[in-house]
């Protein structure tokens, strides 16, 4: 099953702690991002994978910074979406945010994820493309 989330990817933020109530909480913009991703996942009406191992193939398309946009030879690479992003934020933080948001919607539990293919690519059209496939046991 394939899903495209047409909003710029956002990395998982660190939990914040409230000293008065002694509780951990998430920043509001992170909560809003996860709700938006969940909305797109539910609106896709894809069938949830209830059990068994799955593979997540995720590509995060990130809008490039100005220093990359200024170079003419990069323009063609950006249009082809083949210029990899090797800067912060870390790939695992993007992965955590997206898998938390679709947990319970596209699959029952994120513990089902047994294989991962993840990429960060610069693009003029920021979005996240997610493909979930069931892994079959070979007998």
Each PLM stretch: what is its role?
Residues 1-139:
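Acidic, proline/glycine-enriched N-terminal capping motif
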């Amino acid at each position: 099953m394939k899903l495209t989330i047409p909003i710029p990817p956002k990395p998982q933020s660190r939990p914040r702690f409230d000293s008065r109530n002694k509780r951990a909480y998430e920043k509001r913009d992170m909560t809003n991002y996860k709700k938006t991703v969940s909305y797109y996942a539910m609106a896709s009406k894809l069938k949830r994978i209830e059990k068994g191992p799955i593979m997540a193939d995720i590509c995060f398309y990130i809008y490039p910074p100005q220093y990359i946009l200024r170079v003419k030879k990069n323009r063609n690479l950006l249009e082809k979406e083949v210029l990899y992003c090797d800067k912060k934020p870390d790939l695992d933080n993007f992965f955590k945010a997206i898998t938390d948001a679709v947990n319970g919607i596209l699959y029952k539990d994120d513990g089902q994820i047994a294989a991962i293919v993840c990429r960060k690519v610069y693009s003029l059209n920021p979005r996240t493309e997610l493909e979930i496939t069931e892994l079959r046991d070979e007998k």
